[in-house]
Amino acid sequence: MFCQLAQLSGTGEFFCALAREAPQINPISSSQFKHRINFPEIFFLGRDIPSFPVDPENVTSALSIDMIAEFFSSIPSLKICGVTTLRDAERLAKLKVAALGLNFWPSSKRYCSPENASTIASHVAGDILRVGVFVNNSLPLAIELIDECLIDIVQLHGDETIEDIQFFIDQGIPVIKAVSADKLPNHELPSHDFALLIDTPAGKDYGGTGKTFDWSIAGDFVNKHPKIPTLLAGGINPANAAEALTAVKPAALDIASGAESSPGIKDFEKVQALMQTLS
């Protein structure tokens, strides 16, 4: 076990307690980071750029940093989630889709085993951002995949707490925290170190419903927190993507069922239509 998960009494929430030292990876300092890729002053939630645990000799990592900056910028981009085949991943990269999502929650109908993900992720490294989607007790796996340079961004899509998020922030790992639209905070957020993904309420299904929600809720949140990179998910498809962009003005659209022919198999006519909407 890389980290131990303990359940908070009666809350159904989890926190991560580190059970080993962090990976010994040479970090780039904040000043080196800016100079290296001419990073914008505003990154993630408007803070100074953190030190990312990236080996300066690793070309793939350097490319990923630049791609991460673009992904969380004010120009909307596209993340296609629920990728399960190398063929689809390679086609998404060729189309210049910003990011793909690999879902490591075993109960998901778009589940991608670590073995399959290793093949997919290693073949498209540096060509497309690889987002690992984790639910609750998958956190040790997230650390393992980061150590192996198989994912670029961690997406926490369960009942994780700020302690879980902070663990990855402390390692300089970009984090997206998924939040149900009916549980958005209505107050100023005290920590501005991670991005948010607003999704349709799904209970213990943790997303993947293919259903939309009242986008004015997400739009109001973005208006109140303009420096927070906010991704929008939930029932988005080529027919309503333009409306979603107008209503919310997200940093990115996160789409699974709206870009596939069956769970985990992507429909590239839909993908190309979505890309056209974003162009």
Identify the residue ranges that each predicted region occupies.
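Serine residues within intrinsically disordered or low-complexity segments
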Residues: 9, 29-31, 51, 61-64, ...
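Intrinsic-disorder-associated, low-complexity terminal segments enriched in Asp/Asn/His/Tyr and depleted
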Residues: 26, 35-38, 48, 55, ...
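N-terminal helix-forming leader/targeting segments
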Residues: 1-9
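Residue-level detector of structural "landmarks"
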Residues: 16-22
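Conserved N-terminal beta1-alpha1 strand-loop-helix module at the mouth
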Residues: 64-252, 257-279
